[in-house]
Amino acid sequence: MVVKVGINGFGRIGRIVFRNAVEHDDVEIVAVNDPFIETKYAAYMLKYDSTHGQFKGDIQHSSSNNLTVNNKTIHFYQERDPANIPWGKHGVDYVVESTGVFTTTEKAKAHLSGGAKKVIISAPSADAPMFVMGVNEKSYRPDISVLSNASCTTNCLAPLAKVIHDNFGIAEGLMTTIHSYTATQKTVDGPSHKDWRGGRTAAQNIIPSSTGAAKAVGKVIPALNGKLTGMAMRVPTANVSVVDLTCRTEKPVTYDQIKAAVKAASEGELKGILGYSEDALVSTDLNGDPRSSIFDASAGIALNDRFVKLISWYDNEWGYSRRVLDLIAYIAKVDAGK
């Protein structure tokens, strides 16, 4: 079952979702919309990427404002209003909303006017239900038309937190994500009225920042609601981030028991989502890793049998984008009654 998908917003995540779709047998991108990028430039940006390298395939653009990728036509539009994008004309059932602008149910559902059946927001949402693959996707219902794939950090933290809580219980915890810089940050110091630190040069500074990723885990794992919170440190790396979860467990546990539980989950029900490694990893080793969370067994520590620090890596671009497509493939099967 191949699902026809459209992408609104051909920025960082939009393009990485497209690249992942080429490797995803269940999903086919048939249309893209971005009002700020003309087709010729879109072809260039898709072909060349400073972080993930050159596109593995053939990309052409035509005078008819379409892209041809691996001999398949991708219809390209430049509509500012999502309601005007003719998704239905191309058989698009599911739209990836990756502009970062239309992140509420009310705004995102404008895509339905163009013929789309469902909208998947590739960002946290204030009101749309959030789903994290491997954690709560089974709570999806076919009557939901707008949903969120949460954030890259929530996708890293939630599977790990689920394993720890299911096996040993989490009484409370604090998370810090050491996060690569992103497009919202500055190349040189500049004005940022809501976040003064966020206006400082990304490539020169370690910048403390806020994140709702830990609290969002409480939305996808209700038993952890109110038990987790966290912050971010934006660091001068282009890609790959790492979660530090420091938590108090409800049951006494050794670090070896935690390692065994995570390893078992990574080889079982969370295979392909949660990884496990005892290698001496550094961030670039995870560039291009399609998993949501890669537990670093040799980096964590335990103070005692109820207080531990756990470390898990994630490619905040590639791994997250792969989950967007996995979520679409999953809900498509549910919608089809399979």
Swiss-Prot record:
Enzyme class (EC, first level):
oxidoreductase
- Look up the domain of life of the source: Eukaryota
**EC number(s) in its UniProt entry?**
1.2.1.12
Give the CDD domains listed for this entry: GAPDH_I_C, GAPDH_I_N
Inducers of expression? Preferentially expressed in yeast cells, the host parasitic phase. Induced during mycelium to yeast transition and negatively regulated during the yeast to mycelium transition.
- Which residues participate in NAD(+) binding? 12-13, 34, 80, 316
Q: Which SUPFAM superfamilies match?
A: Glyceraldehyde-3-phosphate dehydrogenase-like, C-terminal domain, NAD(P)-binding Rossmann-fold domains
**Keyword match Lipid metabolism:** no
Per the UniProt record, one Pfam family is Gp_dh_C
Give an example GO biological process: glycolytic process
Q: Please list every transmembrane segment annotated in the UniProt record, as residue ranges.
A: none
Site annotated as Activates thiol group during catalysis: where? 179
> From which residue to which does any coiled coil extend?
none
Which InterPro entries does this entry report, sorted A to Z?
GlycerAld/Erythrose_P_DH, GlycerAld_3-P_DH_AS, GlycerAld_3-P_DH_cat, GlycerAld_3-P_DH_NAD(P)-bd, Glyceraldehyde-3-P_DH_1, NAD(P)-bd_dom_sf
Keyword Zinc listed? The answer is no
- Give the family from UniProt: Belongs to the glyceraldehyde-3-phosphate dehydrogenase family.
Q: What is this protein called?
A: Glyceraldehyde-3-phosphate dehydrogenase
Species: Paracoccidioides lutzii (strain ATCC MYA-826 / Pb01)
Q: Which gene encodes it?
A: GPD
